[in-house]
Amino acid sequence: MAFKYQLLLSAAVMLAILVATATSFGDSCAPGDALPHNPLRACRTYVVSQICHQGPRLLTSDMKRRCCDELSAIPAYCRCEALRIIMQGVVTWQGAFEGAYFKDSPNCPRERQTSYAANLVTPQECNLGTIHGSAYCPELQPGYGVVL
């Protein structure tokens, strides 16, 4: 009788592991999965225009709206990761490096660009929810272990 319950429990545990594994692959916040390759182009343009005062001659409100629209199209659980990718980059499962789009320039340090990008989900910018349940990506803030 005990063997029967052990077998049933083992089967239930294996099924739970299988389900968890299957769902985690579909929810991967990687370029080509839940994120597009080369994500957040409008946001990169918006950040550079705000911090470096370079880029297209568009109204700031138009650039911000495009960025927020682009960021809102990304699942909430991947928004912080999408911002991290444009700031620091990532090696995809195919082995290709993507991201780290902000570059140092004499009048526009990369640190200022990445700091601004980290705040795009906040209420002052796009006010979008994240995996943290609020408009905040704490792991992207200086001092949280992020190398800028």
UniProtKB/Swiss-Prot annotation:
The keyword Secreted applies. The keyword Repeat does not apply. Residues 1-24 form the signal peptide. It comes from the Eukaryota. Five disulfide bonds, which are essential for the inhibitor activity, are probably present. The record marks 57 as: Interaction with trypsin. Gene3D superfamilies: Plant lipid-transfer and hydrophobic proteins. PROSITE patterns: CEREAL_TRYP_AMYL_INH. GO terms for molecular function: serine-type endopeptidase inhibitor activity. It is found in: Secreted. Keywords: Disulfide bond, Protease inhibitor, Secreted, Serine protease inhibitor, Signal. One of its GO terms (biological process) is defense response. The sequence heterogeneity suggests that more than one gene exists for this inhibitor. The genes may be alleles, or multiple loci could exist. Inhibits trypsin in vitro. Probably plays a protective role through inhibition of insect midgut proteases. Belongs to the protease inhibitor I6 (cereal trypsin/alpha-amylase inhibitor) family. This is Trypsin inhibitor CMe. It comes from Hordeum vulgare (Barley). The lineage of its organism: Eukaryota, Viridiplantae, Streptophyta, Embryophyta, Tracheophyta. The gene is ITR1.
